[in-house]
Amino acid sequence: MGDREDFLDWFNTTWRAAEVALHNGDAGPRFATWSEREPVTLFGAWLNAADPVAAREVFEKLAADFSRATASEVRLVAADVSGDLAYTVHREITSTSVRGEPRDYTLRVTQIYRREAGSWKVAHRHADSEPEAADTA
């Protein structure tokens, strides 16, 4: 496999499993997919962070709020790899419980990844809510 195929294999297995775990209340796998080396930035749909420690705190807060994920779909729009950097543009369609209340939402996401010691790590994430169809006309 080439770099892009190797990266997409990681994205579709390790990274996706970490997202499902987070939406079931377990931030541990997400910690493992994120860089602990500066710079790290998170412009989340609900919370933001500007360094690895703050990002970890955000993930702990999210995991405390999430439970009982019933659906998790990722629709990849674009992805590429150049050396030790990669990016994805995708939509995350999620059904989970937030503070005990069922919730469905779609996020538009752009992520940048760094290869660190041979492993891919998220270094930047920007996510926002998908506008309603009427808002996009």
For every predicted segment, state its role:
Residues 104-136:
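Short beta-strand edge/turn micro-motifs at domain boundaries
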